[in-house]
């Protein structure tokens, strides 16, 4: 979908981007092709597109031999998408509030993530799309630091830990603001996640969040109610410092500790 096509659709359907939803419509066919290639979609796959917007990706995805599910919060866009792609399932909902969408059947997830709800959407997908093979996101370039950062850094938190445990992450390409309508001031990046078979389940993800509940507190203080004897022994066996915080742990340490405290 080109810039002219996006502008024409906006004009014909009286659609203006809604700042409250963080809407910037992708309009670069090379980037669109790159995202779909990175998704590694196979015939018969069930593909979830979160926030299809004006349909830049939907246009190509709907032509493939797949089961495509799109979730869109903006009712104006839902109306347009249902007319433009009548054979595609368009769910009118806030994805973060959505419950029954067949999450366990999803093979591939694709989304252009608004920065302000990026973490919430990623965590929900991690918890619910338990059989997904591949995940491809467009994020603000500045947000990469929260996904790919190392332990003991300021940005290190549950998102980085779960992302690392969930799969192999690769930065596919950088996307300048000129590839969107309207043009944002920031650069974006496309990332792909090849999901591991032994990815963290919801219980482990909840545990990781709990470890970081209050960053300045020690693990012992954040993990109230756990077996303190087991926790203290695990810390003593693995670290020099006893009053350790979650930010000092490597991603694999969280799984080890979780299994220890079961």
Predicted feature descriptions by range:
Residues 188-195, 200-233, 238-253, 257-258:
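An accessory alpha-helical subdomain
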């Amino acid at each position: 979908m080109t810039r002219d096509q996006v502008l024409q659709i906006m004009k014909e359907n009286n659609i203006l981007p809604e700042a409250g939803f963080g809407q910037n419509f992708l309009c670069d066919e090379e980037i669109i092709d790159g995202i779909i290639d990175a998704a590694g979609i196979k015939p018969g796959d069930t593909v979830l597109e979160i926030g299809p917007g004006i349909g830049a990706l939907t246009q190509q995805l709907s032509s493939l031999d797949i089961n495509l599910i799109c979730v869109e919060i903006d009712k104006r866009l839902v109306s347009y998408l249902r007319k433009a792609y009548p054979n595609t399932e368009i769910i009118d909902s806030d994805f973060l509030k959505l419950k029954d969408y067949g999450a366990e059947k999803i093979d591939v997830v694709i989304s252009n993530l608004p920065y302000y709800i990026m973490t919430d959407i990623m965590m929900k997908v991690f918890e619910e799309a338990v059989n997904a093979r591949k995940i491809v996101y467009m994020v603000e370039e500045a947000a990469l630091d929260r996904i790919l950062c190392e332990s003991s850094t300021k940005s290190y938190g549950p998102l980085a830990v779960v992302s690392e445990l969930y799969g192999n992450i690769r930065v596919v390409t950088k996307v300048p603001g000129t590839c969107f309508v309207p043009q944002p001031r920031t650069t974006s990046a496309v990332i792909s996640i090849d999901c591991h078979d032994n990815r963290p389940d919801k219980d482990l993800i909840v545990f990781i969040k709990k470890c970081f509940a209050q960053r300045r507190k020690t693990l012992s203080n954040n993990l109230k109610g756990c077996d303190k004897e087991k926790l203290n022994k695990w810390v003593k066996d693995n670290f020099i410092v006893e009053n350790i915080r979650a930010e000092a742990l490597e991603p694999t340490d969280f799984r080890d500790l979780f299994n220890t405290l079961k």
